[in-house]
UniProtKB/Swiss-Prot annotation:
Residues 345-368, 388-405 have a biased composition (Polar residues). Residues 213-273 form the HTH myb-type domain. One of its GO terms (molecular function) is DNA binding. The keyword Transcription regulation applies. Induction: Not regulated by Pi starvation. It is found in: Nucleus. Transcription factor involved in phosphate starvation signaling. Binds to P1BS, an imperfect palindromic sequence 5'-GNATATNC-3', to promote the expression of inorganic phosphate (Pi) starvation-responsive genes. Functionally redundant with PHR2 and PHR3 in regulating Pi starvation response and Pi homeostasis. Keywords: DNA-binding, Nucleus, Transcription, Transcription regulation. This is Protein PHOSPHATE STARVATION RESPONSE 1. SUPFAM superfamilies: Homeodomain-like. Residues 1-10, 176-191 have a biased composition (Low complexity). Disulfide bonds: none annotated. Its main location: nucleus.
Length: 428
């Protein structure tokens, strides 16, 4: 590539240059860097050897020493900050403006116009004291023609190579700057960029989610659409089981999206279950009242059941007592029956034993005979004892006749009476 930069216009060539004008730094520096002139020049000479030749020739023509350290030592009292330039890969010309007729302060803007797209323009100014400005304005030499020739010598292929080599570094640094750096540029940078003729495309920010949602098409739900929607929901098993995707597949309506179906399904659910919720509240109130009544009734029932259980328990105790008494009565009856049977047996035994009665009857008459004999022997007692003895004899005869009717009757004198007499005795 053997293209060279265009030469400055004639109006710029006629501008006088003073010997006290500051050196111009090479591109590739950041705008906020406050590095002195000799440091930037040393760095640029290290990175680009050809640039050092250009800078030394330019310094010689302006009256400075070739050594950057000497230049700084001789002029470090005349300025506060070093100038900076802004460059781009497609720079078309080099512009240098100098105003030496100011009093009280002198600013020299140095920059490269025509920035690339997305790379901001940076520029810094040089503040020069009054005495230096006056001395620079008074010294106008006849080296203007040589300076014009110097500009022609600089604009060659070497200068283009230097710009191309540093273009990539400046672009990478400029892309890291925030987007609002373009708004903070001075007005004269904007004017120079307009003269360069470059057009930078302005990228608009991405649309927000609100704009995207606003761009969605709204849909009016007609009664026919709602009926088909309800039919699809019922097919899927109700509003709780239905999904927007399934409803959309069943409806098959052009222009209907899943967002429309989703919103309508939510509205359908809320509208359907809202009255049910109010009814549920009233039902809950009724159920609470019913529960309270049920609790009271259940308490009454439990109390009644408890009383009934107590009564049944008492009845059971009474039945147990009655059963025990009945057992005792049965035992006593059995005991009495045994006693009665024993009495009957004893009576039958006494009746069935006649020998005991026969032995007793003859002894009694003998005793009575003895008594009669004694009475007969005692005359004093005859009158008194005679009726008694007679009665006793009669009684004895009767008992003997009853006990043994077949037995012979014995007379008072001890002789047996005949049967006829026995009958008479019995009849009497």
């Amino acid at each position: 590539m053997s293209s060279s930069l265009p030469i400055l216009p004639k109006s710029l060539k006629d501008i006088p240059r003073s010997h006290n004008t500051q050196n111009i730094l090479m591109p590739g520096q950041l705008p906020n860097d406050s590095m002195p002139l000799h440091q930037s020049a040393t760095q640029s000479s290290i990175s680009h050897p050809r640039a050092s030749v250009v800078r030394s020739s330019y310094s010689a023509m302006l009256g400075y020493a070739a050594n950057p350290i000497d230049s700084v030592s001789s002029h470090e009292g005349h300025f506060m900050a070093a100038p900076f330039i802004s460059q781009s890969s497609n720079a078309e010309m080099l512009q240098y403006l100098c105003n030496n007729n100011t009093h009280g302060g002198h600013t020299v803007p140095t920059f490269f116009p025509a920035p690339a797209c997305g790379a901001p323009d940076y520029m810094d100014t040089i503040t020069v004291p009054d005495n230096h400005t006056q001395s620079g304005s008074s010294t106008v030499t006849s080296d203007a023609a040589k300076q014009n020739e110097w500009w022609a010598d600089i604009m060659n292929d070497d200068w283009k190579d230097i710009l191309d080599a540093t273009a990539t570094d400046s672009q990478s640094k400029s892309m890291a700057q925030p987007s609002n750096s373009a708004a903070s540029q001075p007005a004269f940078n904007q004017s120079t960029s307009s003269h360069s003729g470059d057009i930078c495309p302005v990228t608009s920010p991405p649309p927000n989610n609100s704009n995207a949602s606003a761009s969605k098409q709204r849909m009016r739900w007609t009664p026919e659409l709602h009926e088909s929607f309800v039919h699809a929901v019922n097919k899927l098993g109700g509003s709780e089981k239905a999904t927007p995707k399934g409803v959309l597949k069943l409806m098959k309506v052009d222009g209907l999206t899943i967002y429309h179906v989703k919103s309508h399904l939510q509205k359908y659910r809320t509208a359907r279950y809202k009255p049910d919720l109010s009814e549920g509240k009233t039902q809950e109130g009724k159920t609470t009242d019913e529960l309270s009544l049920d609790l009271k009734a259940s308490m009454d029932l439990t109390e009644a059941l408890r009383l009934q259980m107590e009564v049944q328990k008492r009845l059971h105790e009474q039945l147990e007592i009655q059963r025990k008494l009945q057992l005792r009565i049965e035992e006593q009856g059995k005991y009495l029956q045994k006693m009665f049977e024993k009495q009957c047996k004893s009576s039958t035994q006494s009746v069935q034993d006649p020998s005991s009665g026969d032995t007793a009857t003859p002894s009694e008459p003998s005793n009575s005979v003895d008594k009669d004999s004694e009475a007969a022997l005692d005359p004093n007692r005859i009158g008194d004892n005679h009726p008694k003895n007679s009665t006793n004899v009669g009684a004895n005869l009767k008992t003997a006749a009853t006990e043994s009717p077949d037995s012979p009757v014995i007379a008072t004198d001890g002789s047996e009476l005949p049967q006829e007499k026995r009958r008479r005795v019995h009849e009497s």
